[in-house]
A protein has these predicted regions:
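Primarily a LysM-type cell-wall glycan-binding module
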Residues: 1-23, 78-83, 153-157, 161-162, ...
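Beta-strand-rich domain onsets/edges
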Residues: 6, 61-81
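Short, acidic Ser/Thr/Gly-rich low-complexity loop/linker segments typical of extracellular
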Residues: 10, 107-116
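Extracellular LysM carbohydrate-binding repeats and other cell-envelope/extracellular binding modules
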Residues: 24-67, 190-214
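Structural motif
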Residues: 73-95, 166-168
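Acidic, Ser/Thr/Pro/Gly-enriched interdomain connector segments
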Residues: 89-91, 121, 127-176
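Short, ordered, surface-exposed loop/turn motifs in non-cytosolic proteins
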Residues: 92-105
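Glycine-centered loop-to-beta-strand initiation motif
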Residues: 113-120, 181, 204
């Protein structure tokens, strides 16, 4: 394997998107020896913090014979990744057996949520935005998605993002432990009978991971 180079993650990046741009599957990059410290600190290859360094092999080289008097197009093949989400309301009631339409970077998918309100769809590892419509009539819900923008759980911005998606927070995801963020943390802590610290402490992180999934 060619010598590794370091890629500095930006907002919206994950190991899968970084790997795909260099012609590799995410597992090849994630399991690379050069990412041992990253695996220890982040645990989840799909949740990075801007500034994280990801060791990546050099792009694969390949030779093709082509006439010189013509234009040629080469397409980089990438392995799709699984997008998974469970849809519930404030009372934890699932949006079960509901039709949905998911659009990701211009590609449309249709299906039905399962009995627990879940849906799964393979998407491009470099996808950035999506639009999800679930249900019809009075049960219709719309969600605007940004892939790769969730920060690690042990950061304030990571807690804000999860609290936002769970319906406890409607402010900016800015990494500031301000009054609005503390209020959202307190509401979440009270609902699940945690110590009301108004901080993103370990017990709160564990419960957020349980409720959110990562």
């Amino acid at each position: 394997m060619a010598a590794n180079t370091k890629v500095v993650a930006e907002q919206g990046d994950c190991v899968a998107s970084i790997a795909a741009k260099r012609g590799y599957g995410w597992e090849t990059v994630w399991k690379d020896e050069g990412n041992r410290e990253l695996r220890e600190s982040r645990k989840d290859p799909f949740v990075l913090l801007p500034g994280d360094e990801v060791a990546t092999p050099a792009p694969k080289e390949r030779e093709e014979s082509c006439p010189t008097d013509r234009k040629h197009h080469f397409v980089l093949k990438t392995e799709p990744i699984l997008f998974r989400v469970v849809l519930i309301d404030w009372e934890d009631k699932a949006f079960a057996q509901q039709p949905y339409e998911l659009q990701v970077d211009g590609v449309q998918f249709k299906g039905q949520t399962d009995g627990s309100g879940g849906l799964e769809q393979k998407i491009s590892p470099t996808a950035k935005e999506g639009h999800l419509v679930v249900g019809t009539g009075a049960t219709k819900r719309e969600y605007y998605l940004k892939f790769g923008y969730l920060d690690p759980l042990d950061t304030v911005s990571g807690a804000q993002g999860r609290l936002f998606d769970l319906g406890y927070y409607d402010g900016a995801v800015n990494g500031k432990l301000d009054g609005h963020t503390r209020s959202a943390l307190l509401t979440f802590q009270k609902k699940y009978k945690l110590r009301p610290t108004e901080k993103n402490d370990k017990a709160t992180q564990d419960k957020l991971k349980e409720r959110f999934g990562c």
